[in-house]
Amino acid sequence: METIAKHRHARSSAQKVRLVADLIRGKKVSQALDILTYTNKKAAVQVKKVLESAIANAEHNDGADIDDLKVTKIFVDEGPSMKRIMPRAKGRADRILKRTSHITVVVSDR
């Protein structure tokens, strides 16, 4: 049974989160949690939280056994960008894009 968890509008760029997502794709859930625990990136904390949510959803909603679960799919899409202004010298200003992303984790016992 497939179970999904999502984190929308995560405050990291999709490019940075994809680096972490590629580490755990296809792994067993216990191994994926270990990898994320020792990965020294801000995105690893966000992905770990979504993975733990997917595990809890599978256990509570579908009655799945945690030992059998695998990360079957994980993908990161771009979310909306917040536009901000950075003041510069001589009265000028630059536009800054604060990028967000949507993290989706699918776990399955097959």
UniProtKB/Swiss-Prot annotation:
Q: Read off the CDD domains from this record.
A: Ribosomal_L22 (cd00336)
UniProt keyword terms in alphabetical order: Ribonucleoprotein, Ribosomal protein, RNA-binding, rRNA-binding
Q: Does the keyword Aminoacyl-tRNA synthetase apply?
A: no
Record GO biological process: translation
Which GO molecular function annotations are given, in alphabetical order?
rRNA binding; structural constituent of ribosome
Checking InterPro entries in the record gives: Ribosomal_uL22, Ribosomal_uL22_bac/chlpt-type, Ribosomal_uL22_bac/org-type, Ribosomal_uL22_CS, Ribosomal_uL22_sf
Q: Which GO terms describe its cellular component?
A: cytosolic large ribosomal subunit
By its UniProt entry, which SUPFAM superfamilies does this protein fall under?
Ribosomal protein L22
| Metal-binding among keywords | no
Quaternary structure note:
Part of the 50S ribosomal subunit.
- Purpose of the protein: This protein binds specifically to 23S rRNA; its binding is stimulated by other ribosomal proteins, e.g. L4, L17, and L20. It is important during the early stages of 50S assembly. It makes multiple contacts with different domains of the 23S rRNA in the assembled 50S subunit and ribosome.
By sequence similarity, the record places it as follows: Belongs to the universal ribosomal protein uL22 family.
Protein name per Swiss-Prot or TrEMBL: Large ribosomal subunit protein uL22
Q: What is the phylogenetic placement of the source species in the record?
A: Bacteria, Pseudomonadati, Pseudomonadota, Gammaproteobacteria, Enterobacterales
Q: Which gene encodes it?
A: rplV
